[in-house]
Amino acid sequence: MARSRRRSSVDEMDVGGSATSEYENCGGPSFSPLNLSRPKKSTRGRSLRSAQAWGGKQLHPERSTPLARNDCGPSSKPRRRHEVGRSNKGLGASLDRTDEDTSQCPRIRASAIRCGASTRKIVRITGECDAQQGDSRPGRSEMAGWHSPPKRRRTPSRHGNSDNERSHLPRLSSHGVVRVGGRPLTQTPLQKTIILQPKLVRKVFMPTFTVNPEMHYRRVALGEIPKFGGAGSYGEVQIFKQTGLAIKTASSRSCFEHELAVSLLTGECSLRAQASLGIGGIICLMAFSLPSKQMVFPAYDADLNAYGYRLSRSGPPSVLVTESIERAFIGLGRALVYLNTSCGLTHLDVKGGNIFVNHSHFVISDCVIGDLSLMTLNTNSMAMRAEFEIDTGEEEIKTLRLPRSASQMTFSFVIGHGLNQPISVIADFINNSGLAKSTGPIKHDVGLTIDLYALGQALLELLLVGCISPCLSVPILRTATYYYYSNKLSVDYALDLLAYRCSLYPALFPTTPLTTIYGIPWDQVEGVFESIAGAHHREAFRAHLERYRLTHRRLFASIRIPSAFTGVLELVSLLCHANEKARLSIPLLWTPRP
């Protein structure tokens, strides 16, 4: 059939272009908006009508049914012809009348219009999807008679790029890149060389630090089931044995922010003490999560209480064990001196449950002090109003401010349960004076004497439970009547505790040239009388003292300390010395042992 400047008798939809369709020029298959295939026999009539309406060629012209003349009448108005000058082998958007067939059926014409509209709609949707996927077909051009998909307004940038994008910057995905602070915790964090970086100092005592962004994580994804490690008033601890981590979850937001702030300061001090002075014994924060209120620390084999109970069941300790114990506590004493004097940090909660050890056959290889929930800033601190900028992986940087309570002494935290405090603090509690009435930051020398005395009490507890009591017929306890007072600190219990110390310590503390530099190491009865103000309190103390002389005199007189424990007990007597000057100097901590 001739195709010069006229259409065929069967109207075809025109896509425009050259003699071949643009999709025939592509390397891929020909384009079909409805994904039509070869018509089946059962749908021959419908396929024929669709081919006539969409302009497709008849596959079997001999099977086509001719239209009757009386079915369609001639059109009174000639249809407008699209002058596109392109081939009609593809899809089209208009129906044109020809001179061979001047009479067209209105039903076919209406069907063609509907099909053309459907075609334009489908192709427009397909084009938008291709544009979103970034699929650029070679040789593709705008098609005549189609409604092009809406385009965003483009203006050339100063780099000559019409996509309003900077060509010199890498193109990011629509989801963005997760920053370091927003990643989950999937493995053991690497050992940090720096935790805090000073940024600026706005005012005195108000420095601003930038926290290492690698320390923050979004959630825990370690891939193992944790074990319960313990719980307290400020949170609970879970142990991940495979990765060697201990994750503490705070019970409240205020407790978490306080402990996190002091843990950041303590961790930075720990790194500097180890690098410059070779002082260890301070637990170092490894990672934390603000949304989860969690802090990550290295896990240890046991705390000091569990270590002492296991040691008591293993028999008399060897010389290697006692030497490792002494060496570990000398390191802890140096760490507390460094924290109180150089860093301005007072722990206030030194006890066996907060000291963690790694050991092999009870020979301690590593020992640190942890649980910084009660730590306070003393008068030597220069960061009482410090701020910490934390990158959590979000758009805005979070700012953590050190709470004011972190630098304000609370006497209830200082006195605690009364088990590990020196006589000066207990006397202030009994008399309701001194530290009980003090406000503001605690003095650094007072904080140091409190921490060192508590460290000596923890060492004494370990020796009594794990070393001395197994060798005696009747075990000796460090505190005899604490549970009689329902685990609550009262004036009567404080007087009872002082009377028990005056009865027990003369039987334990050695009197050597090292321990008697500043006088007798244990508390004297006369000194306790002088420290107690009220006459009725003195009478109560005298009554408790007479009772212990009647009930515990023979037991304490039967104590025989093996010579292997003399060096460790010297350290105990210095840490728990009645004279505060002996605790502040601690010659054993800084003098190399022969």
From Swiss-Prot:
Autophosphorylated. GO terms for molecular function: ATP binding; protein serine kinase activity; protein serine/threonine kinase activity. The active site is at 349 (proton acceptor). It catalyses: L-seryl-[protein] + ATP = O-phospho-L-seryl-[protein] + ADP + H(+); L-threonyl-[protein] + ATP = O-phospho-L-threonyl-[protein] + ADP + H(+). It is found in: Virion tegument; Host nucleus. It comes from the Viruses. Displays a substrate specificity similar to host CDC2. Belongs to the protein kinase superfamily. Ser/Thr protein kinase family. This is Serine/threonine-protein kinase UL13 homolog.
